[in-house]
């Protein structure tokens, strides 16, 4: 199947700016199109150092969701965690460590590591890294999927 690449961000809607108070006529209804990227590297029970996931989030983007999709159960796991960060030295500053049990199949929704961590990733692209603290797991494999609004450029409320 053919694919098309846009430089983005992609927006949808018919009214770009609010000039009045009539919905459907002159009140802004344009919104961001949600983008998604999936890791091309598996996080396994043996991924004990920060590992690049092959996911690059464009500057000024708002992260909406980060999911862990288990592709092979984390055998014997009771306390295995997966965390996501934006550098090898800070592999836990984007997605807080999330427990992955021996029966978890997911998708498992991660939480942001700190208040506002997903609002706006900053003025430069970031590469995501994952790390696993296996503890008792003797097997297991997961993929990370990230949904984001490209160049949403949010400011604090």
Segment roles from a protein language model:
Residues 2-157:
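Surface-exposed, low-hydrophobicity beta-strand/loop segments enriched in small/polar/acidic residues
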């Amino acid at each position: 199947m053919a694919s098309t690449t846009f430089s983005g961000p992609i927006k949808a809607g018919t009214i770009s700016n609010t000039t009045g108070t009539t919905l459907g006529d002159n009140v802004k209804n344009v919104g961001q199109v949600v983008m998604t990227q999936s890791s091309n590297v598996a996080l396994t029970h043996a991924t004990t150092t920060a590992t690049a996931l092959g996911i690059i989030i464009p500057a000024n983007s708002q992260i909406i969701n980060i999911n862990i999709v288990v592709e092979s159960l984390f055998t014997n796991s009771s306390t295995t965690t997966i965390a996501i960060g934006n550098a090898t030295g800070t592999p836990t500053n984007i997605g807080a460590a999330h427990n992955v049990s021996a029966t978890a199949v997911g998708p498992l929704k991660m939480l942001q590591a700190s208040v506002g961590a997903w609002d706006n990733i900053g003025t430069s692209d970031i590469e995501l890294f994952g790390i696993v603290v296996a503890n008792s797991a003797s097997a297991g494999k997961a993929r990370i999927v990230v949904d984001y609004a490209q160049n949403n450029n949010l400011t604090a409320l």
